[in-house]
């Protein structure tokens, strides 16, 4: 990268998460200079239906970006990158929002990633055993786009399906709004739509599942022009978008990433040299990036394709060009912790106590656990309390939407101690789920020696330590906590031409903050917890079988 001495260089990263838009100004060293966040609306008209508005999201992107760049010389801003959740955006033939609901509310034109309305449709898709399913862990998830498209065709044919003109993954919608070019990203199409880099779309798949009309016009509705993440799209930032965002016209705009993949990009390239960590020279393929927020995604990369049952992929060049990606995940993690804590009868007491001390509720709970642990490790407080965390189905490695949450060991207690212990057991369950995914990936051929954590839950020291203790692996935290935003900015840096490749940009812009090591003396305890954890799963399947015989 060529740069004049003293010249300021910045990239803008825009991250559209589940509940908010965040924008950061990031320099060429990966330092977040400024960032602003704004919430976005979520509608839940009925259980398992989650909807958003593309107009609302774009307006938030514009408002927040203007705030972030307001004090900077536009000439210093060299590239723009987007990431977003893998939600489905529906537009009509005039590129206007089209309702994805029976109420006809056109503003609500997004089926969110966590929407599970298409359960029947995904079951039928999986029964086809089509060859494309081999690249999604053998079983397609209800959170992917084909079952959602099929649901729209079968439930809103006249109102929505027949009127649709463009069907975007949210990250691609954002780059279209910025550039006027509806080119899609390899990341979105490969990971969520069954696109193959080698063969493109598979006509036989869409025809077999009843979506033969998707093939019309050379797949014009879902994308027939595709680019690698970080490549500069079209004619760059349009005059209209530049005015709305407060950025210079003609600014390079990168092909996008899904938010979890941006997190992986922002954290997994950080060098471990000089940290005294065993295996510091191990390749990037020995690292598992864990992006943990509302849900969690587990990103493992390899030089050759590895097929892992129940784990999405292998996807070629979906995150890092030239490397294969496997993506495990848990559909509810941060959302699960909130659900458990907010639903406890002692929650009001917790809120009052935390407020009186000027603390966040989770900071207070962590401190409270330290107070009640007595002489043993904190984790041992949950020796008799066990949680199976699939309150929103199992994404990996069971790939089973029918799985439900379980709690074993409840008492009549209404105390704050009881709430704190349940909170601890829930975090342990999430970490045990990570171990389950990790061991499945290892068995299939991955060799993981280090976890790299980012996302909102990585700010919680208890969550981080439990992942280290339960997996037995060191956990690397990024110097920049907001690694997803850094990942989006890395895309912009690549689009600008300042870096010749994503790999080089990752190495320069990703930095280690600290490393958390496991308490190996607690291994026997967590091995026993893991044994119970696996029994909870097998027992639940037994219960389903018993009740299914009625």
UniProtKB/Swiss-Prot annotation:
GO molecular function: D-ribulokinase activity
Gene3D superfamilies registered for this protein in UniProt: 1.20.58.2240, 3.30.420.40
Entry's Gene Ontology cellular component terms: cytoplasm
Family note: Belongs to the FGGY kinase family.
NCBIfam families listed in its UniProt record: 5C_CHO_kinase (TIGR01315)
GO biological process: pentose metabolic process
Domain of life, per lineage: Eukaryota
Protein name: FGGY carbohydrate kinase domain-containing protein
Keywords: Kinase, Transferase
The EC number(s) this enzyme carries: 2.7.1.-
